[in-house]
């Protein structure tokens, strides 16, 4: 097996694969929460979780010429280090393709180009699925092709899979009070105040007949209140009473991409982000909350590939030839892992029965 540089050189293949990835990354909903961040060519990534600061004592006065005892100054810091793992894909141009297009390098180039772009997009899909894992579970688990790795981001137990006092598909529930209580838990654990929510259309629809919200909207008793609120009215009440400024309906965001014929992600989002999920977080545009860390590849630093990247990160692409039988492999390789830096500033509740 050898690198083919005549049909589509690795430098061009790399650009095509990266462009496919970047297109998908730019339109998928969680790319703002976990923006791609270069790991500057290193296989080891690190981040500092939020930990309580030590108490700062008051200094004491003394009389002139009087001695004073020693005090102990304390600092609180911690850094987590974790190794990255490759994210790879391979496609194929078969012997049958070659015999049907003898010496047609233009055909082979175009076919290879399409496959490099598709593999780059597939890398973006994998990253998005793992971002969903990070947000919902507070961890990312990879168990495939010899890799058996779990990245755990330390979300406090009191902020994971929490049930409201009364499930929200019960009209007697009080979502405003539940959210207020959850924010207090987050702050007690040194998390930041949330101003964004990631949930589903089913959760919002369940609240459209909620008695507390109906009376809050009307300012009157149930008898004189609307029996069925609009989604905008539900969202408006949550926004006005809980300091929420942005709500993402995750299930519908992917569905809209599909129905608008923009992009159809081949993934069961409902399995990764169940209908009952309600997540509080600081913002959808907060670069300190998380990132999709992009590490190095062996190919990018191998002179034979002639890729010549200034920084060893992102995807690479290469067309590999086999002589017996004659065919080609389309190879795309990279290193990407989403990291939730501030898990303590996120809260995940299961709000429906």
What are these regions (language model features)?
Residues 70-73, 143, 220-225:
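Glycine-rich loops and low-complexity Gly/Arg-rich segments
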Residues 26-45, 117-147, 289-312:
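Contiguous N-terminal and early-domain "leader" segments and peripheral loops that mark the onset or edge
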Residues 4, 14-21, 25, 31, ...:
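Generic detector of well-ordered alpha-helical segments enriched in charged/polar residues
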Residues 79-156, 174, 178-203, 326-333:
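Long, contiguous amphipathic alpha-helices that act as assembly "spine/axial" helices in icosahedral shell
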Residues 30-98:
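Assembly/oligomerization interface modules of large self-assembling protein complexes
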Residues 1-43, 339-353:
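N-terminal alpha-helical "arm" segments
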Residues 148-241, 246:
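Extended, solvent-exposed, turn-rich assembly/linker loops in the middle of proteins
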């Amino acid at each position: 097996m050898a690198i083919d540089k005549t049909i589509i050189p690795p430098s061009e293949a790399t650009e095509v694969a990266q462009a496919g990835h970047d297109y998908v990354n730019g339109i998928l909903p969680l790319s703002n929460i976990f923006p791609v961040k270069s790991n500057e060519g290193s296989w080891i990534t690190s981040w500092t979780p939020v930990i309580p600061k030590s108490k700062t004592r008051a200094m004491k006065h003394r009389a002139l010429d009087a001695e004073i005892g020693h005090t102990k100054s304390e600092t609180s810091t911690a850094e987590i280090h974790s190794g990255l793992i490759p994210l790879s894909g391979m496609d194929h141009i078969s012997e049958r393709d070659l015999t049907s297009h003898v010496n047609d390098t233009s055909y082979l180039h175009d076919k290879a180009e399409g496959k490099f772009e598709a593999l780059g997009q597939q890398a973006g899909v994998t990253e998005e699925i793992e971002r969903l894992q990070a947000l919902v579970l507070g961890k990312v688990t990879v168990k495939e092709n010899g890799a058996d790795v779990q990245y755990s981001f330390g979300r406090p137990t009191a902020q994971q899979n929490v049930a409201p006092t009364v499930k929200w598909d019960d009209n007697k529930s009080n979502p405003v009070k539940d959210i207020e209580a959850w924010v207090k838990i987050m702050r007690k654990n040194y998390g930041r105040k949330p101003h964004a929510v990631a949930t589903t259309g089913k959760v919002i629809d369940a609240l459209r007949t909620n008695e507390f919200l109906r009376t809050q909207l009307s300012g009157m008793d149930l008898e004189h209140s609307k029996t069925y609120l609009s989604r905008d009215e539900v969202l408006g009440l949550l926004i006005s009473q809980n300091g929420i400024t942005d709500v993402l309906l995750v299930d519908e965001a992917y569905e809209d991409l599909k129905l608008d014929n923009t992009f159809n992600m081949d993934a069961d989002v409902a399995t990764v982000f169940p209908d009952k999920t309600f997540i509080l977080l600081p913002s959808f545009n907060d670069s300190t909350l998380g990132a999709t860390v992009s590490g190095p590849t062996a190919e990018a630093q191998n002179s034979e590939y002639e890729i010549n990247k200034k920084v060893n990160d992102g995807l690479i692409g290469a067309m590999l030839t086999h002589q017996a039988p004659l065919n080609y492999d389309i190879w795309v390789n990279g290193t990407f892992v989403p990291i939730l830096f501030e898990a303590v500033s996120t809260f995940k509740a299961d709000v429906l029965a």
